[in-house]
Amino acid sequence: MLKYTDYDIVFQEIPDEVTLAINLSNCPNRCKGCHSPYLQQNVGELLTEENLSILLQKYGKAVTCVCFMGGDADPYDVAYFADFLQRQQIAPVKVGWYSGKPKLPAEFPIQNFQYIKLGPYLENRGNLKSEHTNQRLYKITQEKMDDITYRFRQLSLIHISEPTRRVVI
């Protein structure tokens, strides 16, 4: 059973999407240098279809994607809720999952997702913006996983110039 601790609307986890990122607890990966070690504990509120529906009613018009951050202790439950998000009628959203595992479990239903990030965080390899990262973000189309990790390096080339506050690419 999945529990979530908090959520936020984010702009960088999934390229070109405004994402409702839901942090799931009870992470079994214990990555050295973890940015959210509190998620290693089995804490938070039970994730339910009702809770997801409430979040969609509140934020559905503002977001284009819902991304589960974690959930490696119960990957098939993550897939269940991804399927729910695909079927619900409150707000059409894409679905993503950030997993810290190096690969998906056997018979995992990738058709429930539009995005999946795989790979543990390794301090010496960096995050998705690092050209040396072991992590990969995949876009799922027609049950094929296309690696779009390069998009994070493109995004990191964008910066705000100080004097005019305009975006420079």
Regions found by a protein language model. Name each.
Residues 1-23, 28, 36-41:
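N-terminal [4Fe-4S]-dependent radical SAM core
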Residues 26, 33, 162:
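Short, cysteine/histidine-rich loop/knuckle motifs that typically chelate Zn2+
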Residues 39, 71, 120-121:
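Flexible loop residues that form catalytic
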Residues 41-54, 73-111:
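Canonical radical SAM enzyme core domain
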Residues 60, 105-125:
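Structural recognition of alpha->loop->beta junctions
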Residues 62-85, 131-133:
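Conserved glycine-rich "GG(E/T)P / GGGxP" loop and the immediately following alpha-helix
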Residues 130-157:
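Functionally critical loop-and-helix segments that line ligand-binding/catalytic clefts
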Residues 158-169:
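Single conserved hydrophobic/aromatic residue that forms the stacking wall/gate
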